[in-house]
Amino acid sequence: MSNNWKSVRLRLQNRTLVFLLVILSFGSCYSLKSQGDGFLESVTKDLWSDIDAEDLRAVGFHRKLLGRFRNPYTHLNAFRDRPVARATPPSSSVSTRPDAKRSSTLPPPQKSPPAQHVSAPPPFVHHVTLPSLTSSSKTSSNSTIPIVAGCIAGAVFILLLATGVFFFKSKAGKSVNPWRTGLSGQLQKVFITGVPKLKRSEIEAACEDFSNVIGSCPIGTLFKGTLSSGVEIAVASVATASAKEWTNNIEMQFRKKIEMLSKINHKNFVNLLGYCEEEEPFTRILVFEYASNGTVFEHLHYKESEHLDWVMRLRIAMGIAYCLDHMHGLKPPIVHSNLLSSSVQLTEDYAVKIADFNFGYLKGPSETESSTNALIDTNISETTQEDNVHSFGLLLFELMTGKLPESVQKGDSIDTGLAVFLRGKTLREMVDPTIESFDEKIENIGEVIKSCIRADAKQRPIMKEVTGRLREITGLSPDDTIPKLSPLWWAELEVLSTA
């Protein structure tokens, strides 16, 4: 729950940051618009000042003419070129010197017959005084400062936005990194905030009231379910019927198992689709992909099962190797708790799907014989990467020979299997007789087997080295070993729609 809460809190913080950035952006735009309007008003005021109006009134223009000119300077040339009627002014007329001192009123004209003396207005062009450059520059400077400040604020905003996007994107990339293969984008988004939690009623309906039992697994009973879309799923139900038998330690191990399985995410692994936990009735369930072709153990040792030819076995071996190499390469590394041929399942096209249902059952010191054994994950904590390499060597021997690694009783004889191989018998001599033809490089595979099962764990190669060596022998790439149509791609959409 803590991981889910941290993820939700991070998403809320991201959205809050984006909201604040949007508000700041709109505020900056509105501020620039207001400053622009003020700048236009100041420019208009400078171009058409009160002094200009006084000059026009002084030369006799009527006040109503002022409204006709939005900008008088655009009409100067036209006004200057107009012909002016010349009449003889009286001897006492007003001086028309260009440098005459500006006055708010004109001297009173001399009394004379109006019909004989018509005074023409002095040339308006030469008497109009331009607005003060000092005042205009101050106004322009005052108007420019907010614009420059707005531009700087916008640049800082863009820089902060780019930095924030880069930071959160890189941080999100780190959390998504374990999921980058095998899953589609839809399911990745759900897994980032936790594994989908499903309802018991939905799982019960898919499993036909839990009547479709297909086997058992270390944690309990294994059911087959079918979603409403027709996609098949595997359901592992914990064999604990009462909450009294489910301690806090077991609950912690159960959640650790979910966390571990959800991080593997490989196309050659039985991926976890979801889980269910309910108290009434007490339920602890894990939902996985379903591989329809059974296990490798069944195909090797049951006569009624489909025969595996040489190419199939090489593909199975490489699929297991690639998956284990991926698990060991995670940070921190994840090891398989109990790698056996019975834990390797096959899809419809006989691609590998490694399952890991194992928790391990141990009886507590204070428990009675009738009580349910405590479920603790001891195998996972004790198993090492070297153990996985050893188990892979044994499994590879079983694939090539069709024999169990350990000695088993077969009728009146004992099949020692691996012991004979270690005593010097070649793998070619021990190859499964059901294989009609096989590659001449089988002895090279025998060398890989011997290196994996060395008694000294420190002398065993790491899984990456084993995988590289087998790839040189078989020539199979990771894409050659994965299912052509993974059940996960279909199951995930149905799970998401019901989660």
UniProtKB/Swiss-Prot annotation:
The keyword Signal applies. The keyword Transmembrane helix applies. Residues 208-474 form the Protein kinase domain. It comes from the Eukaryota. Keywords: Cell membrane, Glycoprotein, Membrane, Signal, Transmembrane, Transmembrane helix. GO terms for cellular component: plasma membrane. It is a single-pass type I membrane protein. Residues 80-121 are annotated as: Disordered. One of its GO terms (molecular function) is ATP binding. Residues 32-146 are extracellular. It is found in: Cell membrane. InterPro entries: Kinase-like_dom_sf, Prot_kinase_dom, Ser-Thr/Tyr_kinase_cat_dom. Pfam families: PK_Tyr_Ser-Thr (PF07714). Residues 168-499 are cytoplasmic. The chain crosses the membrane at residues 147-167. Glycans are attached at residues 14, 142. Residues 1-31 form the signal peptide. The protein kinase domain is predicted to be catalytically inactive. This is Probable inactive receptor-like protein kinase At3g56050. It comes from Arabidopsis thaliana (Mouse-ear cress).
